[in-house]
Amino acid sequence: MHFSIPETESRSGDSGGSAYVAYNIHVNGVLHCRVRYSQLLGLHEQLRKEYGANVLPAFPPKKLFSLTPAEVEQRREQLEKYMQAVRQDPLLGSSETFNSFLRRAQQETQQVPTEEVSLEVLLSNGQKVLVNVLTSDQTEDVLEAVAAKLDLPDDLIGYFSLFLVREKEDGAFSFVRKLQEFELPYVSVTSLRSQEYKIVLRKSYWDSAYDDDVMENRVGLNLLYAQTVSDIERGWILVTKEQHRQLKSLQEKVSKKEFLRLAQTLRHYGYLRFDACVADFPEKDCPVVVSAGNSELSLQLRLPGQQLREGSFRVTRMRCWRVTSSVPLPSGSTSSPGRGRGEVRLELAFEYLMSKDRLQWVTITSPQAIMMSICLQSMVDELMVKKSGGSIRKMLRRRVGGTLRRSDSQQAVKSPPLLESPDATRESMVKLSSKLSAVSLRGIGSPSTDASASDVHGNFAFEGIGDEDL
């Protein structure tokens, strides 16, 4: 997650108290909470008490006198670095002390009282699930409530996550972010003050081998089936006409497991697709559509001749990655109308091992760059867990009154309608040469053999590679 403190505000104290400086903490470019220096100092002291001073990053010291504007700016920069360092630390960033501080601050900033509400959560096929939660319930609480409503077993809850999405005019979802443990889902979605934003339940893992665990349960099977049918209908999963015919036949027979087994062999099964954006590969300002899955980033692009191409970057070939944000300045008459100082430009850049001795930076410019980075990190985490022989199955950390809250009534996952005929305008992708030759490339109907991806966040899954592997 991308933490920043891009601005400060001078605010009046409660009941006519003295004015103070508030620091606006943004997560992924959106205001999360507004806090005072004293609140952050209290957080720092609590973390120091629990973990020791040696573990913590430097915290800006107290000042005896009022700060000048220059000193306020300096403190803002120092607090921003502090919050980023704490969040990036595996111990501190996942601590309940840090996360509960952010949850309380979010609720206080949005001035949302603690009360019971009905929250709408969508399944991948658009089916609505209404759950009764508290406005102060954190992400895991809401996920448990949804699982209870669907009668999903406790040991399968960790295979699914809640995502904040924006519903576009055509009904498609544009993914904003995966909801995290430091936020309150009800507050997160309502604070955006737009009916376009929704919360969606979707599987949270990338390796299709984990499907076997989920498919053994009736509810888990139905959730995977509904998500897969939806992804095919949206064109996220790439199918040929013959594959589509086979899938429809299995769907008519209600052979859900066999349907999923066939879908697992298809290109882009289980991938998350992003909105159209721009990359500097294979050439500058190249329009692309990015998808993440199967330990890779896939870039679909159209080169001269209007042929649709695909390049795949394996996460194990990415040495590191970074997300940067900037505010472009208008350049006289050449700047487009409405494009000004307030528009934030986000970029995901990763250093990719093109050949044994050649690393190259690839940059993707997209409002969803942070979400792409989160996907890369989760793919790396999953690879490392699998490499160490661990399991992604998560045990629930908390219980309410010793047991999970269960809804009085369960809700079944509705079977989606039969697949429609494949879009005749969909084009097959052909392999590229020259500049793209070092990247794994496929046509739509070709077998899913090699996959390629890249990363710059200090990638522990980065592997050495020889020319013969490319």
Curated annotation (Swiss-Prot):
* Bridged cysteine pairs (disulfide): none
Organism the protein comes from: Homo sapiens
Q: Quick one: where's region Disordered?
A: 401-426
The name this protein goes by in its record:
Sorting nexin-17
Which parts of the sequence are annotated with region: Interacts with the retriever complex? 458-470
Assigned keywords, A-Z: Cytoplasm, Cytoplasmic vesicle, Endosome, Lipid-binding, Membrane, Phosphoprotein, Protein transport, Transport
Q: Which residues form the Ras-associating domain?
A: 115-206
Quote the annotated effect of residue 432 to A. No effect on interaction with CCDC22, CCDC93, VPS26C and VPS35L
